[in-house]
UniProtKB/Swiss-Prot annotation:
Residues 1-24 form a transit peptide. Homodimer. PROSITE patterns: SOD_MN (PS00088). One of its GO terms (molecular function) is metal ion binding. This is Superoxide dismutase [Fe], chloroplastic. Its cofactor is Fe cation. Destroys superoxide anion radicals which are normally produced within the cells and which are toxic to biological systems. InterPro entries: Mn/Fe_SOD, Mn/Fe_SOD_BS, Mn/Fe_SOD_C, Mn/Fe_SOD_N, Mn/Fe_SOD_N_sf, SOD_C_sf. It is found in: Plastid, Chloroplast. It catalyses: 2 superoxide + 2 H(+) = H2O2 + O2. It comes from Glycine max. The gene is SODB. Fe cation binds at residues 51, 103, 203, 207. Pfam families: Sod_Fe_C, Sod_Fe_N.
């Protein structure tokens, strides 16, 4: 799994970033950390070929066209996301920038032979904050299943109280320093809310599952959690998030 380390402050928001890339001539479509047939038979090679090879690729190509020669040219992907979200008054580059980030993150959430149950501190926090691993699964699956239309469901670590500076219709604030389940419409991700460190996501746009599951989104969600999630990746992100919070 690629490193998700690093700390960047954009408009007062601290969050995990990937080291590079910038949106410039060197910004290219990043492949998943496994072959396109590596998730079979759970997720088909055909799904990866269309989802990564066409949808994700198009987001990258469109983003490069949108930012070249603008004030966003040369900024990091995360800076572009927060700036172009524009407190909910979304600017043209936002959707493609956020979808590039979301998909890079999503591919790293999965691995061949994934699923099962996490261990260590991650499991302890899940049991503390949700009551049990089963209750967490129920809440995450419900968030993903009930996201109307296109969007994403997330497990995130909330590091501080929500300040509302850069989001329209935010999730309700609650106590700090805990795991939370969120859902977001279209391309929106927790980076724009401030104080949320994404740990896990599932893509519930129809193109993510329709070739394999048709309209059976709940079945796709269950298979994702049971057979695809890389809990090692989620645990690593939790460790890095807590280290960043401590050093901020």
């Amino acid at each position: 799994m690629a490193s998700l380390g690093g700390l960047q402050n954009v408009s007062g928001i601290n969050f995990l970033i990937k080291e590079g890339p910038k949106v410039n001539a060197k910004f290219e479509l990043k492949p998943p950390p496994y072959p396109l047939n590596g998730l079979e038979p759970v997720m088909s090679q055909q799904t990866l070929e269309f989802h990564w090879g066409k949808h994700h690729k198009t987001y990258v190509e469109n983003l490069k066209k949108q930012v070249v020669g603008t004030e966003l040219d040369g900024k990091s992907l995360e800076e572009i996301i927060v700036t172009s979200y524009n407190k909910g008054d979304i600017l043209p580059a936002f959707n493609n920038a956020a979808q590039v980030w979301n998909h890079d993150f999503f591919w790293e959430c999965m691995k061949p032979g994934g699923g099962g149950k996490p261990s260590g501190e991650l499991l302890e926090l899940i049991e503390r904050d949700f009551g049990s691993f089963v209750k967490f699964l129920d809440e995450f699956k419900a968030a993903a299943a009930t996201q109307f239309g296109s969007g994403w469901a997330w497990l995130a670590y909330r590091a501080r109280k929500f300040d509302g500076e850069n989001v329209a219709n935010p999730p309700s604030p609650d106590e700090d320093n805990k795991l939370v389940v969120l859902k977001s419409p279209n391309a929106v991700n927790p980076l724009v809310w401030g104080g949320y460190y994404p740990l896990l996501t599932i893509d519930v746009w129809e193109h993510a599952y329709y070739l394999d599951f048709q309209n059976r989104r709940p079945d796709y969600i269950s298979v994702f959690m049971d057979k695809l999630v890389s809990w090692d990746a989620v645990s690593s992100r939790l460790e890095q998030a807590k280290a960043l919070i401590t050093s901020a």
